[in-house]
Each structure stands twice: as C-alpha cells, then as structure tokens.
From Swiss-Prot:
GO terms for molecular function: neuropeptide Y receptor activity. The gene is RYa-R. PROSITE patterns: G_PROTEIN_RECEP_F1_2. It holds the Pfam family 7tm_1. Its main location: membrane. GO terms for cellular component: plasma membrane. Residues 1-35, 88-113, 165-212, 280-282 are extracellular. The chain crosses the membrane at residues 36-56, 67-87, 114-134, 144-164, 213-233, 259-279, 283-303. The keyword Membrane applies. Belongs to the G-protein coupled receptor 1 family. This is RYamide receptor. It is a multi-pass membrane protein.
Length: 367
C-alpha cells in the first residue's frame, strides 16, 4: 500500500513538473528569457505596425519600394505574433501546451513568415539592381510590384508546405527527458518523418535552411555589391548632371544604403542561429540551453530593427513615425516630440519648395 502511494505521488509530481531541466527551472534564467522575448514582442509589434500604417495612410509613401517594405513589415508582424510567443513558451516549458490543432498551423505560419521576409529582401535588391544597372528603362509599376509580392507569398507557401504536412504532436524522450509526459498528456510539436524516413526529413530541413538563408544571402551579396561598385566607382549610365537629377541620384543612394543596412542586420541576426542548427547534433544538452535561447532571441529580434533603421535613415519614415506618435493623446502633450515634429515637417516643406524650383528652372522657356 505504501509502495503504491509512493508511486502515485511520484507520478503526480512528474505531471506537475514544468520541465525536468534544472537550468530551465531556474527562476533567474526564466525571468531573463521571458524578459528578452517580451521586449522583442512589444518593440517589433509596435514598430512594424507603425510602418504598415505610415505606408498605407500616406499616398506619397505608396511607392514600389515602400510596397516591398510594407510586405516586409507584414512578415515581421507575423514572425512577432507567431514565432516569439508560441516558440518561447513551448521551449521553456519543454512541451506544447496549445493543443493539436494549433501545432501544424503555427509551425507552418512561422516558416511562411520567415521565408516571406527573406524573399522580400531579395525582391527589393533585384528591383534596386535593375534601377541602377538600367536607369533608362522604365521602373516596375505598383501593380507589377503587387504581383511580385503575391508570387513571394506563393513560393514561400509552397516551399514550407511539407512542414505543415508532417508536423504533429509527438513524445520524444530525448527532448522531454521522461516518457511519463506521454501519460501526463504532454507532447512536443515537431515534424515527424517516420512515415517517409528520417533521412528525407533531415534533407528537407537542410534544403529549407539553404533556401531561407544561403541563396537569399548570395543574391543579396551579388546585387548590392554590384550596386555599390556602380554608385561609388562609376557614373551611372544615362545619369544627367543637373541639380535635379543629382538630388534624385542622392536620394537613390540613401535608399540603397538603408536597404544594405537592413540586409546586413538580417544576415547578422540569422547567421549564428543557422550555424547552431547545423551543428546542434554535436552539442550537449546542457550547453545547448545556454546557446539556443540567446541565438534564437537574436534571430527573432531581427523583426525589431527594421523600423528603427527606417526611422533613423529615412526622413519620410521618421516624420511619419513622429506624426503617428503625435496622434497618441498621452504623447501629444510632450513638448520635445511636438517640437521635433514641427522642425521635420518644416524641413520637408522646404525641400519640396526647392525641388519644385529646380524642376521649374529645368523646363525650357517658350520663345
């Protein structure tokens, strides 16, 4: 009787455990990780929501490049909503607490949003490459840009479709640490390739990493390197030399610098995590805990940086951010924000007047 009672108490205790890992049970470690993900979630969601609002609410901001930036912001919002909360909670608890229906849906949406962001960066780089290399040819239209964006979503959706097909709730003793989780109705959400062979699953995972990071990085490296060589080493073919065209060329250069910064941040944020995923089989579990969360957090934090880059390096986005902030009642009373907004608005009006005068002077006068 006593033995049965002891076994029952032990089983009850196992079911109440959040996870068997002593590191993940440490309150300071949990607090640090949850704080990191909470900051990423708030900053990324607010920043990218501002970007979406600025582009959609302001007709002058509805350019081809900004349409791509809008799509990039939407992808980052999805990453923020789907990757950060679900992944962080399930990893810290070491089981999937959200039910069987959400398991494949969330896993597919996570992969989709990451691929959309990567492919959108590629689309922007190709657009800039064509503008610089063939400046006399007409730019792609806004309608054609929407077709490209739709194609990005379609290709990304097809690419990650197997991840949804093979994602299910499973019990893995190597991850959960004990088979008692199965009896306690605690599972992990993961891709299960036992029906087709685990070697095919490993191959698909490597192909995904190649398509999500390696190929986009190579394309971005080629396009922006070529653009840099043309801008800083040669005069752009067909580029006029009057002040109006020089100002336009300067604006192009600023936009390209901004997008190069976005690409560099993307590469820096995702490279360590992808390297970790390649060598994860050769890393012990105790070390993996300390490596995974900082590097996964770095990759997820990529969604935070783009709005900051836009605000810092683009006057229109910066003014748009300030206008949105001024529309918030509690911030409207802040004199410093109000003064900055007035200064930037005045500068923008002065620039428009100068540009109008230059265009007027460049027009031929009638005899």
């Amino acid at each position: 009787m006593d033995a049965n009672t002891t076994r029952n108490e032990s089983f009850s205790l196992d079911c109440e455990l959040v996870n068997p890992n002593s590191t993940l049970a440490n309150v300071y470690f949990l607090s640090a990780v949850y704080s990191m993900y909470a900051i990423i979630f708030v900053v990324a969601l607010i920043g990218n929501s501002f970007v979406c609002y600025i582009v959609l609410s302001s007709p002058p901001m509805r350019t081809v490049t900004n349409f791509f930036i809008l799509n990039l912001a939407i992808g980052d919002v999805l990453i923020t909503l789907l990757c950060v909360p679900f992944t962080s909670v399930s990893l810290l608890m070491q089981y999937w607490p959200f039910g069987g229906i959400l398991c494949p849906v969330v896993n597919y949406s996570q992969a989709l949003s990451v691929f959309v962001s990567a492919y959108t960066l590629v689309a922007i780089s190709i657009d800039k490459y064509m503008i610089i290399m063939w400046p006399l040819k007409p730019r792609i239209s806004k309608r054609f840009a929407t077709y490209i964006i739709a194609l990005v979503w379609l290709i990304a959706g097809i690419t990650v479709l197997p991840s949804a097909t093979f994602t299910t709730l499973i019990n893995d003793e190597n991850i959960l640490g004990t088979s008692a989780y199965e009896q306690c109705d605690k599972y992990i959400c993961a891709e299960e390739y036992s029906k087709v062979g685990q070697e095919y699953g490993d191959l698909y995972t490597k192909v995904l990493m190649f398509l999500q990071y390696v190929i986009p990085s190579l394309v971005l490296l080629f396009t922006y390197t070529s653009i840099g060589v043309v801008i800083w080493c040669h005069r752009i073919p067909g580029e006029a030399e009057n002040s109006r065209d020089q100002r336009i060329a300067k604006n192009k250069t600023k936009m390209i610098k901004m997008m190069v910064t976005v690409v560099c941040v993307y590469t820096i944020c995702w490279l360590p995590y992808n390297v970790l995923m390649i060598f994860k089989e050769h890393i012990s579990g105790s070390v993996m805990v300390y490596l995974y969360f900082p590097l996964h957090g770095l990759a997820m934090s990529h969604a935070c940086y783009n709005p900051i880059i836009y605000c810092y390096m683009n006057a229109r986005f910066r003014n748009g951010f300030l206008q949105v902030m001024m529309s918030i009642p509690c911030l409207r009373r802040c004199n410093s924000i109000n003064d900055i907004s007035k200064i930037l608005t005045c500068r923008w009006k002065v620039r428009r007047v100068h540009l109008y005068r230059e265009i007027t002077r460049a027009q031929p006068t009638s005899a």
